[in-house]
């Protein structure tokens, strides 16, 4: 399945991506979970990775972070002249059933070029998920698990994660 997840909050993007991956994979391993940064990776390499069979698993996920080619304002990129977008469009139109290809766009939905061939192929053959900003009452729901952890840490400091603490 092909997914395009867009939103301004990186935490919510990653959470949505993890939910999709957990549903399809169950267990995340370095072999069945591959992540590429599109600003440094050719789309041909991403398509090749998506076409490889998952070793020892029934399913795998390929994550494409920062797909600048989906934005209205495309950034200047050194690898742009070597990109073969038609290969990506062909893959999106005929995806491998044993692979989930997930595009993570860390921007609002209005910044995505919805007229591009790649976006239209994703929309026709996959799922587009636009994460909106939470409203006032939703912020409370989003932050509640985090705030409960803070309360637990105050009661029992040994439960705090082992990040560097300030020395006195």
Model segments located where?
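Conserved beta/loop motifs at nucleotide-recognition and modification sites
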Residues: 1-168
């Amino acid at each position: 399945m092909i997914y395009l997840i867009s939103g301004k909050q990186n935490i919510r993007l990653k959470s949505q991506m993890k939910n999709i991956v957990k549903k399809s994979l169950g267990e995340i391993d370095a072999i069945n979970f591959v992540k590429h940064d599109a600003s440094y990776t050719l789309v041909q390499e991403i398509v090749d990775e998506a076409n490889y069979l998952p070793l020892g698993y029934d399913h795998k996920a390929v994550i494409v972070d920062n797909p600048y080619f989906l934005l209205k304002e495309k950034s200047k990129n050194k690898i742009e002249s070597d990109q073969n977008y038609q290969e990506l469009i062909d893959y999106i139109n005929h995806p491998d059933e044993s692979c989930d290809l997930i595009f993570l766009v860390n921007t609002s939905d209005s910044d995505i070029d919805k007229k591009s061939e790649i976006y239209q192929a994703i929309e026709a053959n996959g799922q587009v998920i636009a994460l909106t900003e939470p409203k006032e009452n939703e912020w409370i729901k989003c932050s509640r698990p985090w705030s409960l952890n803070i309360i637990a840490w105050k009661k029992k400091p040994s439960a705090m994660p082992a990040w560097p603490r300030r020395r006195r």
